[in-house]
Amino acid sequence: MKLRIKVKPNSRTDEIICEADGSLKVKIKAQPVEGKANKYLVEYLSEVLNLPKSKIRLLKGESSSFKTLEIDSEENYVNDRLSMFLKHSQS
């Protein structure tokens, strides 16, 4: 399945937020330097989704805050796992 997200690196905490428009924003602690944030994003999502890192691949957005990921898993499973960690935006 493909997942479009907005990433906010250099955050105080790692968290997944559902924005008011329904889009997903992932805050991560890693700095956006030399691909560290992208690597950390895959590691973080691997933990959240309980999948090996090899099942998560960055398709688009290597140097952008908007990213498209390919996740080699059933869509229902991914959605269920994400919903366990989801916080809703206050705006």
Feature map (PLM): residue ranges:
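Compact, glycine-rich, soluble single-domain proteins
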Residues: 19, 23-48
